[in-house]
Swiss-Prot record:
Mg(2+) binds at T66. Residues 182-252 are annotated as: Small ATPAse domain (RuvB-S). Keywords: ATP-binding, Cytoplasm, DNA damage, DNA recombination, DNA repair, DNA-binding, Hydrolase, Nucleotide-binding. The RuvA-RuvB-RuvC complex processes Holliday junction (HJ) DNA during genetic recombination and DNA repair, while the RuvA-RuvB complex plays an important role in the rescue of blocked DNA replication forks via replication fork reversal (RFR). RuvA specifically binds to HJ cruciform DNA, conferring on it an open structure. The RuvB hexamer acts as an ATP-dependent pump, pulling dsDNA into and through the RuvAB complex. RuvB forms 2 homohexamers on either side of HJ DNA bound by 1 or 2 RuvA tetramers; 4 subunits per hexamer contact DNA at a time. Residues 1-181 are annotated as: Large ATPase domain (RuvB-L). The keyword Cytoplasm applies. The gene is ruvB. This is Holliday junction branch migration complex subunit RuvB. DNA binds at R291, R310, R312, R315. It is found in: Cytoplasm. Homohexamer. Forms an RuvA(8)-RuvB(12)-Holliday junction (HJ) complex. HJ DNA is sandwiched between 2 RuvA tetramers; dsDNA enters through RuvA and exits via RuvB. An RuvB hexamer assembles on each DNA strand where it exits the tetramer. Each RuvB hexamer is contacted by two RuvA subunits (via domain III) on 2 adjacent RuvB subunits; this complex drives branch migration. In the full resolvosome a probable DNA-RuvA(4)-RuvB(12)-RuvC(2) complex forms which resolves the HJ. It catalyses: ATP + H2O = ADP + phosphate + H(+). Its EC number is 3.6.4.-.
């Protein structure tokens, strides 16, 4: 069953996000540190009439990495060509993409950490010196062909920056860490989305929805659609704080933005492992989830909210988690 709080795209959300996508940095809400840096770097590159240095955007899913890539291209006034790591299966696939670039273009590779190593190695010379050497033919008739490339900007996006090889990571001149959004920024995003889709929402309701959206715009916009449905059927269409709370409670999204899977993780750690420490692999088996899913989708928010700590011997539940779930806190828990 799909989680309402899943960070990844669900259904037609890709087209919805394109509708909501800001075009320029001044329209982009949140991520101020990344925006401020990019504003300087982009303006400097434009004044020198050079391509922007290659950019690596990393952080949890749903925080606007793809949107930021499009905004960068718009700010530069150039075209953006989009692909993803899993879509580039062979070296020839990447060569075809690179050979199609025009001077100054932006090449956006989502999930760049999932590129095969043979493909990644072609990027090294392309990023550093704007050329590639490829082998044509086979056996005794094979020969090396040198292809010059126009200056371009590669923007890579990843949720797993640690999985990038050192040679690839070193070739990005600009890195942007996309962080979970502040509630005030998410409130503004919710109100902007409501305005675009002609929804009526009280400011206090937008704040409540934002507060329970795990710091993620994608989740906030998804919850807004479900709260709107609830308001239309169970109310008069106006999204109020009371309507928002009832709708989110119905969706099993609690006051801290946790759903049943998050609570299952915490309850399992408390009831089965006495609060920990417990290894991630062991915990994943117990709750019947993939290890990578727990590490990428659930754990970051639980750590950010202070419900779980990472220690040398495993994950440990915090006193805050005990209190939130109504368990007596054991002072002897090992950390």
């Amino acid at each position: 069953m799909t989680r309402i709080l899943d960070n990844d795209l669900i259904g037609d959300e890709g087209s919805v996000e394109r509708t909501l996508r800001p075009q320029y940095l001044r329209e982009y809400i949140g991520q101020d540190r990344v925006k401020d840096q990019l504003m300087i770097f982009i303006e400097a590159a434009k004044r020198r009439e050079e391509s922007l240095d290659h950019v690596l955007l990393f952080g949890p899913p749903g925080l606007g990495k793809t949107t930021m890539a499009f905004v960068i291209a718009n700010e530069l006034g150039v075209h953006l060509k989009q692909t993803s790591g899993p879509a580039i299966e062979k070296a020839g696939d990447l060569v075809a993409i690179l050979n199609d670039l025009e001077p100054g273009d932006v090449l956006f590779i989502d999930e760049i950490h999932r590129m095969p190593m043979a493909v990644e190695e072609i990027l090294y010379s392309a990023m550093e010196d704007f050329y590639i050497d490829i082998m044509i033919g086979a056996g005794d008739t094979s020969r090396s062909v040198h292809l010059e490339l126009p200056p371009f900007t590669l923007i890579g996006a990843t949720t797993r920056a640690g999985m990038l090889s050192n040679p690839l990571r070193a070739r990005f001149g600009i890195t942007g860490h996309m962080e979970y959004y502040q509630t005030a920024d998410l409130t503004e995003i919710v109100e902007r989305t409501a305005d675009i889709f002609d929804m009526e929402i009280k400011h206090e309701a937008a704040y409540e929805l934002a507060r329970r959206s795990r710091g993620t715009p994608r989740i906030a916009n998804r919850l807004l659609k479900r709260v709107r449905d609830y308001a239309q059927i169970m109310g008069d269409g106006m999204i109020t704080t009371q309507i928002t709370d009832k709708a989110l409670t119905m969706l099993d999204v609690d006051q801290e933005g946790l759903d049943y899977v998050d609570q299952k993780i915490l309850r399992t750690m408390i009831e089965v492992y006495q609060g920990g420490p417990v290894g991630l692999g062991t915990l994943s088996v117990n709750i019947a989830e993939e290890r990578d899913t727990v590490e990428d989708m659930y754990e970051p928010y639980l750590i950010q909210k202070g419900f779980i700590m990472r220690t040398r011997t495993g994950r440990v539940v915090t006193e805050k988690a005990y209190q939130h779930l109504g368990y007596p806190y054991e002072k002897t828990i090992k950390t």
